[in-house]
Amino acid sequence: SASGFNILIRAKRDGRWWFLKALAPAVRNNEVYQGLLQKEFDIMKHVQHPGVVEVTGIEEVDGYGKCLVMEWIDGVTLEEWLQQHHSKAERVHIANQLLVVLEFVHDMQVVHRDLKPSNMMVTRNGSVLKLIDFGLADADSYAVLKEPAGTDGYVSPEQQKGGPTDVRNDIYSVGVILDKMRLNFSYRLGLKRCLRPLEERYPNMTAMRQHIHSLHRNLLAFWISSGILAACTTGVVIYNKVNEP
């Protein structure tokens, strides 16, 4: 399939399926785009994590030129997954994974810059979330691709206008994604801050996760003090009701 200036190919080698990401013919010999493909490889090797698609190499492939070689993921995009029926607990489980992997990516000094459900996959076995596209990701150590980037509807206003690029741009995009996931009360309160003007957003993913946990604990404390918990035979009912983040 084609995606912008890239081509995605499913290939089989040594009895195993792989994902190849190559440059489209129109830009295949362009040094800038070749540099961007190399940059994506370097960044993905730098942020190795269970929540990031594994890249194993960058090599020449007949008919396609240089390709990123990535693990094949048996699953669907988060965009497709959200169109299916899933319980609130399942949606919270996926949202938790998104926050965890982004906290790691940001701790590695990388900003994704193009977070959206179609750039994430959920595996069929185990419902594991994986980020699959770092084509627009950036880090301070790189000089290429420092212009506005992102996808309408998910990109932050300041990033769209070419303003400062930092983790708060990704946090805005996370807020948009969480809003589409129809999560529990603590998440709904948390995502509102993601969508505020730049200086009013969470400064980083750690602060966001801690705030959502705090909102959840306060909600449980309120239910306990109000006697709601006493009306239940076990705390499991409450746990299932709010889905701890």
Predicted regions and their residues:
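Short beta-strand micro-motifs within the conserved protein kinase catalytic domain, predominantly
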Residues: 54-66
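AlphaC helix of the protein kinase catalytic domain
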Residues: 77-87
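Conserved short submotifs of the Hanks-type protein kinase catalytic core
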Residues: 63-77
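Catalytic-loop of the protein kinase fold
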Residues: 106-122
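Conserved activation segment of eukaryotic-like protein kinases, specifically the C-terminal portion
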Residues: 145-158
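AlphaC helix of the eukaryotic protein kinase fold
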Residues: 27-46
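Activation segment signature within eukaryotic-like protein kinase domains
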Residues: 94-95
